[in-house]
Amino acid sequence: MNATRIPTLDDLTSAVRFLTQLPRLLRRTFTTEEVHALLRRDLGRREVNFLDLARTAIFANSKSPFRKLLHYAGCEYHEVENLVRKKGLEETLRELYRRGVYLTVEEAKGRRPVIRDNTNFYVAPEDLRNPGLQADIAVRTSGSRGRGTLVPIDFASFRANSYDAYLDLETRCGLSWHHAFWLVPGSLVITRFIRYTLSGARIARWFTLVDPGSAALHLRYNWSMRFLRWAGLLAGVRFPRPIYTEFQNPIAIVHWMESVLHAGETPHLHSYASCVVRVCETALEHGISLVGAQFTMVGEPLTAARLAIVQRAGARASIRYASAEMSVVGFGCMAPQATDEVHFMTDRCAV
């Protein structure tokens, strides 16, 4: 066995937490009343939530680079609190930005030093982690310009931050759809399975772009797929087995969607934008109608050309804009003026 594929002690510890804590999380699904109450709560507590985060994750955290930047700007907690009370959250962030309290992508990744006048330091990825969160699992950023960064996910707080998937499906009348995923193995798949399950959505198929039997696949990812299904069984939820489906030949997905449509139901595939396009191209090549099918496109921009192929196949698509660091930032608009228009999640984000 290749040494790089041997699970580490951290992997084994995460596996134990995974199997003991995830079933408990999955057993209690959202209700409509609960979701809308959580949304009202978070919209009404934006400033309070921000100040709580600033106090515990920044000012009480000696490793936080934002604490260093705030010190450089001459801001203590009470001043930030006063700014928020007087000017509101967005204007406070603009004021802090003008004072140099921000990180560029290059600075946050540690590729360039943070330089503000006489202040000069490097940021390590772990310096940006919230010390109050336990890393039950970790997701890795896309790493489009280098190796991705690990971002911890805490099951204890996961549920309170997962109701957005319910709202998206509810808005699209999609809670009763037959849902499927076509993604690469890893923690991002796991988090999406959890979000959909908490919404009470049925996951009918699990298509994977990487062969689970491949010798090149790290054991961590192979076992994570098994642990997810085992945790589901412990919670009374039966997750489907992963089905290896090559990018160039997604005919199995097309046939599944066709069978659901023939049964008078709605199939919904959650996948990367280029993969959705390939599914629609395959359907067109085989003369199979996807009228009534739904897609959620992630990971890549939804261009006019991509949307045109989806529409030509008879399907409809929405987008989901997210990052590993921030989770969901925006969901697709139901009446967009542009193909990639999203509704910004102001309950959890601010610009």
What are these regions (language model features)?
Residues P7-T29, E34, L38-S318, E325-E341, ...:
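Active-site phosphate/ATP/adenylate-binding loop shared across adenylate-forming ligases
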Residues C349:
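Glycine-rich, aromatic-lined ligand/substrate-binding cores of catalytic
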